[in-house]
Amino acid sequence: MIDRTELSKFGITTQLSVIGRNPDEQSGFVNPPLYKGSTIILKKLSDLEQRKGRFYGTAGSPTIDNLENAWTHLTGGAGTVLSASGLGSISLALLALSKAGDHILMTDSVYVPTRMLCDGLLAKFGVETDYYDPSIGKDIEKLVKPNTTVIFLESPGSGTMEVQDIPALVSVAKKHGIKTILDNTWATPLFFDAHAHGIDISVEAGTKYLGGHSDLLIGLASANEECWPLLRSTYDAMAMLPGAEDCQLALRGMRTLHLRLKEVERKALDLAAWLGNRDEVEKVLHPAFEDCPGHEYWVRDYKGSSGLFSIVLKNGFTRAGLEKMVEGMKVLQLGFSWGG
């Protein structure tokens, strides 16, 4: 059996085969069992009174622990908390690092539900949000206010696909004592190491590539040493944990994540190149293409590209024509998710 303290010396294939598994604690079975339940039997009255250890189903389970520990290893963070969706993890991260009277700088290319969270719930709680150009780089310093507590990044951006200059943004944040949150769903930890690049909290919708089969909803948030207590205490207060079955499916998906990402990358690049030669297409927005905004940062910072990209159609395309095209497709279908 591999010594887990030396696991990082091995390749990613070996690591993904080992993390989240503890045969010695499971009667020799390779995969962890599925733990479902709400009530947990405690031996002492003092344990019940002090909420010591695992005292109720909302405090997690061995199934959840296995996935959290595996993701912490993969991200290099100090700890991980799970939630029932990617948006749930984004919410946890923002709530952990902001309070009434604080100011957040949010990339203008952010996932629309994240924008709705900021403009709705957080605004109601007294948190101010300003949106910045995702290509701003070090000039974001001009937007920093005395009460700015968070810079939120999403790279590449939703729809518009700009790759951000993450080291430049992190440098400004650290200079002013501001925390950084990155939505790393597109790249996953395999293609971008968020914490190694100075990000404080990295969030991901595991619904996409970690699950990979369109049959689960799960979010993950990993934090560095400084932000981990804040993230964990926020999670404990809100009990936003996912279902046990989704955790088990996510653990299964983790075993083949590296294989699926590479195949997704290959197929997406082929499709993007084909679309780029179509008369109807004005531009393909794919971070691996030289004319994509921030391509140089993708080359510098990323280890690969995943499957999500955008196209810009030439002028003259009507709504009716677009409907005819997308509703007439036989293999590619309309839907709000990707990666499955």
UniProtKB/Swiss-Prot annotation:
Pfam families: Cys_Met_Meta_PP (PF01053). Gene3D superfamilies: Aspartate Aminotransferase, domain 1, Type I PLP-dependent aspartate aminotransferase-like (Major domain). One of its GO terms (biological process) is methionine biosynthetic process. It catalyses: L,L-cystathionine + H2O = L-homocysteine + pyruvate + NH4(+); an S-substituted L-cysteine + H2O = a thiol + pyruvate + NH4(+). InterPro entries: Cys/Met-Metab_PyrdxlP-dep_enz, Cys_b_lyase_bac, Cys_met_metab_PP, PyrdxlP-dep_Trfase, PyrdxlP-dep_Trfase_major, PyrdxlP-dep_Trfase_small. Its EC number is 4.4.1.13. The modification N6-(pyridoxal phosphate)lysine is found at K208. One of its GO terms (molecular function) is cysteine-S-conjugate beta-lyase activity. Present with 2610 molecules/cell in log phase SD medium. PANTHER family: CYSTATHIONINE BETA-LYASE-RELATED. Belongs to the trans-sulfuration enzymes family. This is Putative cystathionine beta-lyase. The gene is IRC7.
